[in-house]
């Protein structure tokens, strides 16, 4: 077993080196002198920052990125203050009108998949950290609309299987325009019954997903995913709090995330395998944006229901060709070798059909670098080898796999994708499903 593992590591390393040599072979001097700038999503920022560091150290590419939130990132792109943006939701109708009026071109391409997790800080009566919390969609909606305000509420007891101490719940929401808020509220709007519609009406917001989550009742609003995660993890002041972040932010801090009840009645954690399984029911619109209705309704026992993709937004015209070359090399890197780190960072890697979407987008850039064929020798994305990378089937660090064995659950093995074969099935299944559904039309699920 050890010998096979060593050969596998050597093979991956050789593939990464070959890919990096491809990236720097074309005009390395120009690449070293050009800086490409982007802004946007904090949901994706852990991955983007890792990839920026990788290409800077390995090939000298200079990529700047500011995690200012999806809404601000789109605005910076709209007024040409950045070369690319990253967002969990596409441009809204008013933004599209401004883009067209200014002749600013754009295209969407997926960069990474992940789960929007509910990170929490909760202790039992003896003061020990609770790490196996389970909640249903109705209970989550109750907490994040103000209907449920105490951890001893009967709905929480029913989901978790035992009573929690009587303590006020502190929901932590985003204070800034956020793709994370949009993804989370889209889930609530689709799964919570009347909770979200009543809340939306009371708050004067559309009965749909929103980038600007209202502050309500005992809720605390924090800026950025880091702000939400830091509040929840913030010592005594964070006890009793629960906030929505991309899984990686909880993993970084060693804090637990909720096992969410899915459409099968099972409770699932946002492991890379569970996210990949959930996204086998996602469909792509003609512009490569996502429709997640099937994800929320996915009846696979392992499916994590609050799963989604994040997009990069780039121009197809009007970009300096030298910048286009650098941006294109960065895109080729994160679609391939960069995805090896997705699972350990708290994400799930892009499947083969979405690698192709990225490669096709690179070809549309001014000054685009050479784009290789997609295979294991040119692209070190783990899904091309039928896996999701290291740690794909594990419970996120800080969370107990016991969270998946309550209620209608059937144990951690069932809900975390089991052994490596479960992750491999997810890697293959998501590609096949997206390939079949790639031309689905959208449903207008987002509202600014």
Where are these regions (language model features)?
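Flexible loop/hinge segments at secondary-structure junctions
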Residues: 31-438, 444-446
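Secretory targeting and sorting signals
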Residues: 1-31, 448
């Amino acid at each position: 077993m050890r010998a096979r593992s060593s050969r596998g590591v050597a093979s991956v390393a050789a593939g990464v080196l070959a890919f990096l040599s491809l990236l720097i072979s074309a005009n390395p001097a120009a690449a070293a002198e050009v800086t490409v700038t982007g802004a946007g999503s904090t949901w994706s920022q852990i991955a983007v920052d890792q990839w920026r560091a990788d290409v800077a150290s390995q090939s000298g590419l200079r990529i700047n990125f500011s995690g200012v939130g999806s809404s601000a990132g789109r605005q910076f792109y709209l007024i040409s203050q950045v070369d690319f943006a990253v967002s969990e939701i596409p441009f809204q109708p008013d933004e599209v009108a401004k883009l067209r009026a200014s002749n600013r071109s754009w295209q969407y391409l997926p960069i990474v998949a992940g789960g929007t997790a509910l990170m929490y800080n909760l202790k039992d009566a003896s003061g020990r950290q609770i790490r196996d919390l389970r909640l249903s969609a109705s209970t989550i909606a109750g907490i994040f609309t103000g209907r449920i305000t105490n951890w001893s509420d009967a709905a929480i007891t029913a989901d978790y299987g035992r009573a929690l101490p009587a303590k006020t719940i502190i929901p932590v929401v985003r204070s800034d325009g956020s793709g994370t808020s949009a993804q989370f509220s889209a889930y609530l709007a689709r799964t919570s019954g009347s909770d979200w519609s009543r809340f939306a009406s009371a708050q004067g917001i559309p009965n749909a997903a929103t980038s600007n989550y209202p502050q309500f009742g005992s809720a605390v609003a924090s800026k950025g995913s880091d702000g939400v995660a830091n509040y929840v993890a913030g010592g005594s002041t964070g006890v009793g709090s629960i906030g929505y972040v991309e899984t990686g932010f909880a993993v970084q801090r060693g804090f637990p995330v909720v096992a969410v009840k899915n459409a099968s009645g099972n409770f699932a954690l946002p492991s890379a395998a569970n996210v990949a399984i959930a996204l086998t029911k996602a469909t792509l619109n003609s512009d490569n944006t996502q429709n997640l209705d099937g994800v929320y309704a996915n009846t696979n026992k392992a499916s994590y229901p609050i799963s989604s993709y994040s997009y990069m937004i780039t121009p197809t015209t009007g970009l300096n060709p030298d910048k286009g070359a650098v941006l294109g090399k960065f895109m080729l890197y994160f679609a391939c070798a960069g995805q090896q780190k997705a699972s350990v960072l708290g994400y799930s890697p892009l499947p083969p059909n979405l690698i192709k979407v990225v490669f096709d987008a690179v070809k549309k850039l001014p000054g685009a670098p050479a784009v290789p064929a997609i295979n294991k020798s040119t692209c070190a994305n783990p899904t091309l080898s039928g896996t999701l990378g290291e740690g794909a089937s594990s419970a996120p660090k800080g969370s107990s796999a016991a969270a998946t064995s309550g209620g209608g659950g059937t144990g951690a093995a069932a809900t975390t994708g089991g052994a490596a074969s479960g992750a491999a099935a997810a890697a293959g299944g998501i590609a096949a499903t997206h390939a079949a559904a790639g031309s689905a039309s959208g449903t207008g699920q987002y509202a600014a």
